[in-house]
């Protein structure tokens, strides 16, 4: 054995408090879109979701699917093309516009009456609605409950000090017999300040354990050449399924 860690023996890093005071403002996230600093976007979609999607959907149609901090995630069109209703929230209007443009979807925009100064973008087909606002303002819009949440790049982007508020927001959107698919990253948080932030299993239990059954479905090596600039040499991604207790 050469000592290389595999996707099945990932350790939890003990120094989980080192990132707790890290803060990125909404304006800084918007600047990332304006300046093209969106390496977190996956042009081909998320491979773990693609692998498990049909198993999760079980042939159902007409589900309501929520994408927190959606950006221009191509997976939104995957669900819409399968007959589901997609709702996303994203602070960057540019990111939302790029989604519709890159997916060749016509759309309209209208003000969100409950949140002055914000807009919702709706596909002409009517099954994709993307709200351009802070996720913490979203419950004011009465958008209803969801059958499924796809959380990739959301919890790991939320400032650590806001995670409890974020989890409570997610709980307010969950319908009966929900499936909450959650991706988190595992790396040494003493070497990279984030975002994306390190979210250990214990944190998921703390945030969601009282209401959800929590199961880790898969762990994969997600390290890429660009991650060397973070000062790390190891990065794993974990896919969790959260269901109603």
From Swiss-Prot:
PROSITE patterns: SAM_MT_TPMT (PS51585)
pH curve summary: Optimum pH is 7.5.
Binding site for S-adenosyl-L-methionine: 29-40, 69, 90, 134-135, 152
Impact upon substituting residue 180 to F: Allele TPMT*6; reduced activity
Binding site for substrate: 40
GO molecular function: S-adenosyl-L-methionine binding; thiopurine S-methyltransferase activity
Name of the top EC class for this enzyme: transferase
SUPFAM superfamilies hit by this protein: S-adenosyl-L-methionine-dependent methyltransferases
Modified residues (N6-acetyllysine): 58
Subcellular localization, as worded in the UniProt entry: Cytoplasm
E.C. numbers: 2.1.1.67
Record key words, sorted: Acetylation, Cytoplasm, Methyltransferase, Phosphoprotein, S-adenosyl-L-methionine, Transferase
Notes on activation and inhibition: Inhibited by S-adenosyl-L-homocysteine (SAH).
Modified residues (Phosphoserine): 14
Catalytic activity of the protein: S-adenosyl-L-methionine + a thiopurine = S-adenosyl-L-homocysteine + a thiopurine S-methylether; mercaptopurine + S-adenosyl-L-methionine = 6-methylthiopurine + S-adenosyl-L-homocysteine + H(+); 6-thioguanine + S-adenosyl-L-methionine = 6-methylthioguanine + S-adenosyl-L-homocysteine + H(+)
Gene Ontology cellular component list: cytosol
Result when mutating residue 49 to S: Allele TPMT*5; has very low activity when expressed in a heterologous system
Subunit annotation: Monomer.
Family the UniProt entry places it in: Belongs to the class I-like SAM-binding methyltransferase superfamily. TPMT family.
Name of the featured protein: Thiopurine S-methyltransferase
Species annotation: Homo sapiens
Upper lineage: Eukaryota, Metazoa, Chordata, Craniata, Vertebrata
């Amino acid at each position: 054995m050469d000592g290389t860690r595999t996707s099945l023996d990932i350790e939890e890093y003990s120094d989980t408090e080192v990132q707790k005071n890290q803060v990125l403002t909404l304006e800084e996230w918007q600047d990332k879109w304006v300046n093209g600093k969106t390496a977190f976007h996956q042009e081909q979609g998320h491979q773990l979701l693609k692998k498990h999607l049909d198993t999760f959907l079980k042939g159902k149609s007409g589900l309501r699917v929520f994408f927190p901090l959606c950006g221009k995630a191509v997976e939104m069109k995957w669900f819409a093309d399968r007959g589901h209703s997609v709702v996303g929230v994203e602070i960057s209007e540019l990111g939302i516009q790029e989604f519709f443009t890159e997916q060749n979807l016509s759309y309209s925009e209208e003000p969100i009456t409950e949140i002055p100064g914000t807009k919702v973008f709706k596909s002409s087909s009517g099954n994709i609605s993307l709200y351009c606002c802070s996720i913490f303002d979203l419950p004011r819009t009465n958008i209803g409950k969801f059958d499924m949440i796809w959380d990739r790049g959301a919890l790991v982007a939320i400032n650590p000090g806001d995670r409890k508020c974020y989890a409570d927001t997610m709980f307010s959107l969950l319908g009966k017999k929900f499936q909450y698919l959650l991706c988190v990253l595992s790396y040494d948080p003493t070497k990279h300040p984030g975002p994306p932030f390190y979210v250990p299993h214990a944190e998921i239990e703390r945030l969601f354990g009282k209401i959800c059954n929590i199961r880790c479905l898969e762990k994969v090596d997600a390290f890429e050449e660009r991650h060397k600039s973070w000062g790390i040499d190891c990065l794993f991604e974990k896919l969790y399924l959260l269901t109603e207790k």
